[in-house]
Amino acid sequence: MALDFDEYWRPFIILREQEKKSRLQGLDAQKANIAAGKSVARILRTSLGPKGMDKMLQSPDGDVTITNDGATILELMDVDNQIAKLMVELSRSQDYDIGDGTTGVVVMAGSLLEQAEKLLERGIHPIRVAEGYEMASRIAVDHLESISTKYEFSATDIEPLVQTCMTTLSSKIVSRCKRALAEIAVKAVLAVADLERKDVNLDLIKVEGKVGGKLEDTELVQGIIVDKDMSHPQMPKRIEDAHIAILTCPFEPPKPKTKHKVDIDTVEKFQTLRGQEQKYFDEMVQKCKDVGATLVICQWGFDDEANHLLMQRELPAVRWVGGVELELIAIATGGRIVPRFQELSTEKLGKAGLVREKSFGTTKDRMLYIEKCANSKAVTIFIRGGNKMMIEETKRSIHDALCVARNLIINNSIVYGGGSAEISCSIAVEAAADRHPGVEQYAIRAFADALDAIPLALAENSGLPPIDTLTVVKSQHVKENNSRCGIDCNDVGTNDMKEQNVFETLIGKQQQILLATQVVKMILKIDDVITPSEY
């Protein structure tokens, strides 16, 4: 216990547990929080844009990941600071809602914090800064709506969707194949989309990968690929017009659930037991054949004796198939999952035009292709690549492209990329600042400056002089009244993003601004940080 005095020299007692806690208050707390947020943004800043750098992250158990996906980088980083964890959550929210723009949203939040720090040092109250930021974000979101363009597409004319997905893939390690991968992503989304209701269920798209081959061998399969093979090497490798029994129950004689033992003291008794088990399993196989099944896919395993019997009775089977894959197979083939063997019937069988086993490489890795299904609303993107890291990064890139295509189907408004939308919003917010009397005007101007962080980072990562490039593009915006001018990252020779076909979804860009503002407001309102001491 200790005695201390407050600012009016009134004595108060500190309990021993409280003595052990460290505490930051007022401006010190806000500066510490801002510094933590800025440090996270600084890490991601170099990964922004088509010329952004990748990060290599090693997990405690030695797994190595190479990526430039903002959400993945922050997910794998070992972050202790609570404010830094907020930035990780921010990136995760953007990934969950939109799927793309996870790096940009953190860079923008870091820039907003940097500008807020300058205002706090000038004595402006954090609440006034937060209110100014809120006003500015509304102005920016409304301005994005006004400069957006409706992008018309149909099931036959998919070029607008492909171009927007290509913009997303430009910043990824797979950018050399961006056209092919964008087309695959768009076709996959359209296969599972309900265009009338503007609804897309991405769970119906399975992304599978296999080491070997090259990235260009990546394909879209109208059906399901399962990383399994037939349970017996002598079973047929190709089944046409397959009727599939999908079982989640054990495909073997039942075992008593209570504690039991069987005394066998003669050879005859053992043979009787074995014969009984064989007969029971024979009846199960016969029931499958009676209902018309030509292939059994089972969630559980069965022993080698059962496997041999299946081969003898000419009933191909696949064992140890995961629950998620079983669901997709059921959706694709129009079958029903059978939880109890007694419930198996002809109506519950799935139908597929072709089931084939395909071999890969010299090691004879095999996978099962279920194609020409009764219901085509379940597809698989099958990725090939030189190593596991490449395949994992391609999966992340494909996920972003799928999300962008989904967002365009839900809302077909686009804005132009390359930092053009941020520059246009910055000019609009700057112009609107004069209409707001009071201290908030400073915060609105600071918000406009913070929006410039995205084009500055794009220019810097592309090896261009950032400030010179930004001022030239800004003057172009004002002189020509052209909101399509952005940073020419690829040195094409024009900074008109319409000519370069660089597009981003409107809802993705609006969400970026709103989420970043929300988190920054939350951080600015923290004026007291109490943490337990380390000893």
UniProtKB/Swiss-Prot annotation:
Signal peptide: none
InterPro entries assigned to the protein according to its UniProt record, in alphabetical order: Chap_CCT_epsi, Chaperone_TCP-1, Chaperonin_TCP-1_CS, Cpn60/GroEL/TCP-1, GroEL-like_apical_dom_sf, GROEL-like_equatorial_sf, TCP-1-like_intermed_sf, TCP-1_chaperonin
SUPFAM superfamilies according to UniProt: GroEL apical domain-like (SSF52029), GroEL equatorial domain-like (SSF48592), GroEL-intermediate domain like (SSF54849)
Family: Belongs to the TCP-1 chaperonin family.
Record's keyword annotation contains Nucleus: no
Disulfide cysteine pairs (residue numbers): none
Name of this protein: T-complex protein 1 subunit epsilon
Quaternary structure, from the entry: Heterooligomeric complex of about 850 to 900 kDa that forms two stacked rings, 12 to 16 nm in diameter.
Subcellular location, record wording: Cytoplasm
NCBIfam families named among the record's database cross-references: chap_CCT_epsi (TIGR02343), thermosome_alpha (NF041082), thermosome_beta (NF041083)
Gene Ontology cellular-component terms listed: chaperonin-containing T-complex
Function: Molecular chaperone; assists the folding of proteins upon ATP hydrolysis. Known to play a role, in vitro, in the folding of actin and tubulin.
One function term, GO molecular function aspect: unfolded protein binding
Keywords assigned by UniProt, alphabetized: ATP-binding, Chaperone, Cytoplasm, Nucleotide-binding
